[in-house]
């Protein structure tokens, strides 16, 4: 998709200041994709409106606007087709995730400022949950090698790992490529989606379905990875989770936490809005917060480091 100067489409949601995709393009693209308009290309607005049960005038106006960014092109016969800037699968996943964030922020941040609690999340339909996982997987594929390098530099003798809250499975797959035996745990509805394409089974990743506040594997691991999970919880839940993880760490092993840490990268302060809008206590917690919580949970050492090119930081801890 055509981007503003300095903007990479795949960075739109986690971009720095003044580097984000045009909000108009993001919302228009997401609306067109959600309504099935893009999947119906090539066709005329009249044909698409009839086929999809949409308003013909609205379809035409939306397509004309998308043509400004070369997402679609108009033909001489009044039909529209995919344009040179039509995004590929990865960019589409990121743009749609970004679009949902814009709508969510505009709807709920005002409520949060006035102290209204976060409403319990409605059950996310299969397609919506899959789109969310797809967007997270785009970033994870980009960041996983750097994360694995850092974890194995700190725990070089690790031969087994638990990817806790592993979702899309990209980190688990990268650790398998490094020669580790890996178990990935997440909620049942997430693990079902993570296994659809068969990559987890082909790689030999063991999948453990369950809420990690209720059930964890009954054996120890050299490395426990908690990637992009801790910032979704408040202090109480973080401490409880670390206490539950502590017995799972084998002698000589440790815990690796990736999170948006507020005092280490300015993008984390922006990401905290996502936590404000969608969680009851999530935040871009500080490095001091993590050190204090880990110590209270029984860990003896804790150190934070930046990951090259990533907005998240890595917090490493040993029992």
What are these regions (language model features)?
Residues 298-319:
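Core SAM-dependent methyltransferase catalytic element
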Residues 99-256, 261-262, 312:
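Conserved adenosyl
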Residues 27, 133-141, 279-284:
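Short acidic-aromatic active-site loops that bind/stabilize oxyanions
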Residues 71, 180, 299:
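Short phosphate-binding/catalytic loops that engage adenosine nucleotides
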Residues 1-111, 116-118:
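N-terminal accessory segments
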